[in-house]
Structure formats: structure tokens, C-alpha cells
């Protein structure tokens, strides 16, 4: 299938354009460079069949020839995905060698692993498994097509990757000096949740490989700041799970971790009391419904319940609860319900807890295993 036949997807009632991964760019650049090296002819457009079954037709840029090598670039198009790599040039340099076989390495702007991570050894270029295979197959196809009797050295480099890497999770994933060459399908789908959840899983897996069986989860910067400023924790064993609380718990179970402690602002965590495990506002809200119901259970009158339902922020709701003398009891039952849903999601194989706070009032409540989990994390 050609890219133009599958260039849009529907997300949240909007038509959004797909793009292609850094892995596809690297493989296409390698194929084009190999074709020019072994044929002696210039290639201005290259085709690439992606693992997803979509065929790309990409413009070849920045062609440079030397005696025994050719380099060129493909410009990445992320489609409508909010991606820091959109528009960068991914280069491949192919050099002939008389001996059969192929080497593949990363140059400037391609990160290197500082430790063993998944299938990658320390010191290796951060070119993931599927892109490695795509690149090798692309070059091999040209070796066979033009009947070259030797081998090839392949170098992938992304000059802009050095600066872009500073905006990514790579340093936390044990990758330094540049970005990763990524992609399992070859295609970037707009607003893909998969990339985020894979990063969360990888961070947790690295902790496990380092021997850690417990860690903190935080939905975002508020949780990280609270860990550091209020709890005095340096975040070494804290994984930012964004809105994907349920997925992060599933990851912990999958990795056979012993315990997770979720620390977050009431604006996110209160939703869990309603069983909401993806806390993005687009998925569900339920903040005021939860607070109103639990306030009613604590003895709130109809007027108070209605006032809570009219609130726009949890700060407003907390002010009402505090003024009515209902805050402590409301938070107690909210935390009980949060614990119920977290425990139900985690099952019996992993301990899980939650500590909820607000900027103005500090700690609002905690589940029964919080103190135990904090000691285990250290």
C-alpha cells in the first residue's frame, strides 16, 4: 500500500495525517545510498515497504559521493504527531568493502547505550531491533540487485539529534549523545499512546534489571516536585507514568515487581476513586462526582453537594470541604476507594499504594500500604 492511501486516521473526531518513523528514514536512506553506490546512478526517490505493509515513496536529499562510499538523507515527516523529531534529516553512509558481510553503526546524533538495555549492549548505537533489521534488509537487497561480490559498512547519523536528545527521555533510559532510531511498524500514527506507554515500561524494566523491586509512580511534574520538595526524595526510583496509571500498574505486574507507590495531585488521583485508570480529561473526569458523593457520605447537605458539583477545580472543592468541616472524612473514604481500585487492578501479586496531595494543603490522604512501600523504596 502506498503512503497516500493510508495517510490519515481518525482520532477524537478529527482527521489526522500519518507520518513515518526515524527507522523508516534510516532504512530508506540506506537503501538509496546503497543503490547509488552499487549502480553508479543517482537516485532521487526511493521506495520502502514498512513492517506495517505500507509502501513509502520518499525524496532523497543531501547526496554526497566519494570513491568507495555514498551518503544521503531522508527528511522525517511525523504527520500530525507532536514529535520533536519532525523535519529532521536522517542520514545513511554506505561504504564498500571487499569482504562479505555488513556492519551497522551510529554516528553523530545517534545515541549510545551506557548500559545493557533489553537486547542492546553497553556501547552499542541506539538503533532498535526492527530498524536494524529494516536497514540491513534494505542494503542487502541492493547488494543482491547489483550483484556486488563484497560487503558494506553502514553508518546512520542524525546531526540534529544531539540537541533533540536533550528534550527526550533518553538520558533516563541509559542513552547518551543523541536520539534513538525507533519504530516497530515504520509508520507514525498521530497522537500515538503506544510510544508513551512503551517508554514507561522501558523505564520500569531498567529499574528491574538494576535489581530494584519497588518504585514510585508520578503522573507528572507536580508529583515529582512533591517527592523532592516535601518528601525529600531525589526521584532516582520514580517513574513518570503520565495519565497511564492503569498501564503502569499492568507493567509492574508484568515485570514481577513487588510494589508501586503512586504519588500525585488530587486533580489526577481522585479520578481513580471512580475506577478511572487513564486520567486524561479526554478519557474521563469524575472529579467533582467523586468528591460530591464522598462528601454526602460524610454528612454533607444537599446545598453543599450541589456547590461541589458546580466547582471547576479541585482547589475550589477542597475549600468548600474544609469550610464545612468535611475534609478529613471525605478524604478518608476517597482514599479507601482509590485503594480498592488500585488493588483490584494490581491483583494479589504486587503491592500498590497511593499518596494524594494538593498544593495548598499538602498530604490529603494515603492508602494503607504507603508507609511500608516508602520504607521498601528507601
Predicted features, each with a name:
Residues 2-167, 171-173, 369:
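Generic N-terminal targeting/processing segments that precede catalytic cores or assembly contacts
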Residues 2-10, 17, 173-179, 184-333, ...:
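A structural signal for small-residue-enriched, beta-sheet-centric alpha/beta enzyme cores
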Residues 25-28, 32, 247, 251, ...:
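Residues within well-formed alpha-helices
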Residues 33, 131, 135-146, 203, ...:
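Hydrophobic, Leu/Ile/Phe/Ala-enriched alpha-helical segments that form helix-helix packing faces
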Residues 89-91, 230-234, 367-374:
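Surface-exposed flexible segments
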Residues 163, 224, 363:
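Flexible, glycine-rich phosphate/dinucleotide-binding loops
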Residues 351-378:
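Short, amphipathic C-terminal "tail helix"
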